[in-house]
Amino acid sequence: MKVITIKDMIRKDVPIYYRMLYTGVAVIDLNNKPTDFRIDFSIEIKPTGQKEIGIVFIDSIDYPLVPVTKELKAYIDEIDSQGGLPD
């Protein structure tokens, strides 16, 4: 299982400056077959400076959620660090 990309990412308007909400389509390689899932995710910056990433799956997934969520959080953190998220 590997996250290939998150396509069609759109940032939603939120009046809270330390919270960013996004929607998109996660493309994940499950058993050597790319599969698309619609997701909503948020990145919240805590007062300590730590990032908290939350993910909501809009489509149902026929795969254990814990490893998928862990991989997606790592991928989102990586693209956020590289400045790859839309403004």
Where are each of the predicted segments found?
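Acidic, low-complexity intrinsically disordered segments
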Residues: 35-87
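Hydrophobic beta-strand positions in extracellular immunoglobulin-like domains
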Residues: 26-28, 43
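A short, amphipathic edge element
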Residues: 1-10
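Short, solvent-exposed beta-strand/turn "edge" segments of beta-rich domains on protein surfaces
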Residues: 10-19, 30-32
